[in-house]
């Protein structure tokens, strides 16, 4: 599973960094940003990025499943602010999740926000790769590792300023 391999490689890299820092007396702080909204490359293959690109191209917003996966998001300026908080106030050897408590949504909710953020575009949310034409049954999945707890970064004074809807609008404009 590619997602599992990615997660394991990140944990390994964090462990190596902390061990190296302890051995050589270095100051290491770890940032774990959630998906960061901002300008998106047209070739970006991440699920949420494809929705932004579709809206930027005035195309239907397509979901290839029921949209139940839940993610944390943060706008780029808030992510940069969190990184500065970590650099200036974070504790060496600690890892900090960067996310916005008000931006934990399912992909279905994210798609609807992309649509509602641009009412002038008359975008529609479409479910594809179905044998029938009906919308797939929806049941939000339980919280997954894609939703990050940001209590530790908030203890450093981090407070996101950009709403998810504004972050989506800005991302579409910048794409």
Question: Predicted regions: what is each one?
Answer:
Residues 1-30, 35, 43:
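Catalytic helix-loop patch of NAD(P)-dependent Rossmann-fold dehydrogenases
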Residues 12, 16, 20, 51, ...:
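Hydrophobic alpha-helix immediately C-terminal to the catalytic Tyr-X-X-X-Lys motif of short-chain
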Residues 29, 36-38, 79, 103:
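Conserved sequence/active-site signature of Rossmann-fold short-chain dehydrogenase/reductase
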Residues 39-40, 156:
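Residues that scaffold the ATP/ADP-binding catalytic core of kinase and kinase-like folds
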Residues 44, 48-49:
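Amphipathic alpha-helical segments in well-structured domains
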Residues 55-175:
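C-terminal substrate-binding subdomain of Rossmann-fold SDR/epimerase-dehydratase oxidoreductases
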């Amino acid at each position: 599973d590619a997602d599992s391999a990615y997660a394991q490689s990140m944990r390994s890299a964090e462990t190596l960094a902390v061990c190296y820092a302890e051995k050589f007396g270095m100051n290491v702080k770890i940032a774990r940003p959630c998906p960061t909204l901002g300008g998106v490359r047209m070739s970006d293959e991440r699920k949420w990025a494809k929705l932004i690109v579709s809206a930027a191209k005035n195309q239907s917003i397509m979901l290839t499943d029921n949209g139940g996966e839940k993610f944390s998001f943060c706008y780029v300026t808030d992510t940069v602010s969190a990184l500065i908080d970590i650099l200036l106030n974070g504790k060496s050897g600690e890892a900090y999740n960067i996310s916005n408590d008000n931006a934990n949504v399912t992909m279905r909710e994210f798609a609807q926000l992309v649509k509602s953020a641009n009412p002038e575009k008359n975008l529609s949310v479409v479910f594809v790769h179905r044998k029938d034409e009906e919308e797939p049954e929806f049941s939000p999945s339980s919280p997954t590792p894609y939703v990050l707890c940001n209590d530790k970064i908030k203890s450093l004074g981090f407070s996101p300023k950009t709403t998810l809807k504004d972050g989506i609008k800005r991302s579409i404009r910048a794409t």
